[in-house]
């Protein structure tokens, strides 16, 4: 790394009498911050109206609703089995990237969409592979792949006319931003998203400045 090399030459100048530090005019490369892309609530509402009532559409609606309702990762969705979701109690169990499982609530609209899919479309899709345990399957009754999931989302993003590419991460970002904008605390959001380091969750605070000001205006006696 440049910093280490620069430190070495600084040492050589001070201790060994090196005439010049060859790194002194070299600028450290700027590390670009990864842009966080997310949808507005109105865009989410539009998105959820796009899937039709075909078996594919019913499945796709369940996928979209569940990704947005829970903020889970693409890998967590495609690895999910039917036993991981409890529609009656309204939660799912997600192991994710960490060993420790986390429990995530599922909202009413997502529960209804997943229940409709499980009671109708999924049974048809797995007719040639009835032992399949993965929740989301393709036309062949096999688990939806990562590539397949991205293709599904891209299709609906283009239908909606979004300026950004619709990906699982965009829906995960949308979940995080909307939760914070509506009053969720960072620590709780960290638990829901499965972040080991809270700094990974805090990046979303940049999109909640208006909410923070509203809280201040309501709470501070001299605001």
Feature locations, PLM:
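Conserved catalytic core of the tyrosine transesterase superfamily
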Residues: 1-223
């Amino acid at each position: 790394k440049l910093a280490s090399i620069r430190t070495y030459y600084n040492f050589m100048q001070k201790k060994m009498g090196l005439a010049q530090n060859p790194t002194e005019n070299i600028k450290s490369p700027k590390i670009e911050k990864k842009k966080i892309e997310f949808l507005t609530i109105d865009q989410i509402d539009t998105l959820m109206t796009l899937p039709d009532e075909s078996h594919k559409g019913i499945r796709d609606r369940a996928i979209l609703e569940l990704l947005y309702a829970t903020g889970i990762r693409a890998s967590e969705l495609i690895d999910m089995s039917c036993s991981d979701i409890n529609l009656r109690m309204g939660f799912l169990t997600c192991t994710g990237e960490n060993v420790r499982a986390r429990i995530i609530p599922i909202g009413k609209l997502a529960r209804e969409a997943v229940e409709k899919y499980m009671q109708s479309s999924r049974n048809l899709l797995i007719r040639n592979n009835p032992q399949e345990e993965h929740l989301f399957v393709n036309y062949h009754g096999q688990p939806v792949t990562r590539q397949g999931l991205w293709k599904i989302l891209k299709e609906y993003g283009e239908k909606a006319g979004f300026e950004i590419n619709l990906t699982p991460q965009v829906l995960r970002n949308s979940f995080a931003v909307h939760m914070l904008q509506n009053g969720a605390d960072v620590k709780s959001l960290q638990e829901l998203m499965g972040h080991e380091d809270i700094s990974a969750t805090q990046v979303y605070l940049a999109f909640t400045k208006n909410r923070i000001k509203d809280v201040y205006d309501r709470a501070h006696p001299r605001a």
